[in-house]
Amino acid sequence: MNLQENKNPSFIFDLYRQMNHYSLSYIYRGGFSIDLSNKILSLAETNMENFSESSSTKKKVYFIMLESLQNITRHQDVKTQESTDNSSFFVIQRLENDYYITSGNIIENKNIDSLKSKLSKVNSLDKESLKEYYKEILAQGELSKKGGAGLGLIEMARKSGNKLSYDFKEIDTELSNFYFQIKVSVPEVEPGFKDINIDRLTWIEGLEKLILEKNLNLIYQVDFTQESLISILSMTEGNIGNKQDLALRKKIFNIIVELSQNIYKHADEPETGKEGKSGILMLGEKNGEYTLTTGNLILNKRIESLSASLDKVNEANFEELDTLFDKTIMEDEKKGQKGAGLGFIDIKMKSRNNLTYHFNQIDADYSFFEIQVKVSEKQ
């Protein structure tokens, strides 16, 4: 299927078609904690199990993710101006036989030359030289308060068998964004170092800028299944309000469940034999208002009935929604299955807002269906 035919795509559709060739894409922007890092690692472990990766691959990916996440948590205490967003971000993507692990955080400009020197040194060495260099650093005992003298960089290069890809983008005279990416090949290839495609890192840099502009915290593009829903809920927990606002967290969790199940149960796509349905979920927040957006493929012949169902929900007031809810349940019981309409009603009742939706036509058979809902702390 050609996903490039729509000449005026929405943001989520444009992002979906760019990421569609990945079998896994997880993007998080915000504050990092040990608990959140553990959840990200757990998510990766679950997905690697689903891909039936070898034990060797899982160990390599896990180690590099752990080092990248530790680097973020160690350095996210850099002091910034109020106007400067100091959020860090983390990305893991699987493309054909490779995992791409990318991290980003703010760094003080005065530390760039030292870090560049370490990265350049590591990239200049072959496998045996890296081993000797690791021993040399250990013998010298050059450890800093931040947790090392480049040992993690050396080990990531050794375990991945690839060069370290990196970039710095100046924010102001004191701070810069540091971007770091490493590739792990699957299945394992012959030892040797291959240059990573810098265009992939450049794309991530541009994506991070868009994510910041649109106040997004989480993007999850994967095959949606009941199992993946558990991972999604686990990862969104750190992005929703504070721990005391249980009502808000529960409300958003329930809406995420409905939106995700809408993809899993009602998305259309060419027969592939896989269990899940491809789709994308985004979560953003600005001034206490959360925006949840999902997108997936549907058949064009379903657009009219789906639009009618959504319009009926949007036009109903909240008293009418109760009646519509009961009526829809009875209709679903007659048909012997739950339709998407019941989920739409539930989403509006919980969010107290109408649902925004849009269709991006792809070809004669399929369109990309996106749906968005806003939830406020004040509601």
Identify the role of each PLM range.
Residues 49, 70-74, 261-265:
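Short amphipathic alpha-helical interface segments enriched in basic and hydrophobic/aromatic residues
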Residues 6, 13, 17-26, 39-41, ...:
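Conserved beta-strand-loop-beta-strand hairpin that lines the nucleotide-binding pocket
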Residues 66-67, 154, 257, 261, ...:
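Short alpha-helical basic/polar micro-motif
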Residues 42-67, 139-146, 234-257, 276, ...:
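Conserved short strand/loop->alpha-helix "switch" segment adjacent to the catalytic nucleotide/phosphoryl-transfer site
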Residues 33, 54, 108-111, 126, ...:
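Helix N-cap and loop-to-helix transition residues
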Residues 1-58, 191-242, 249:
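C-terminal effector/catalytic modules and regulatory tails appended to multi-domain proteins
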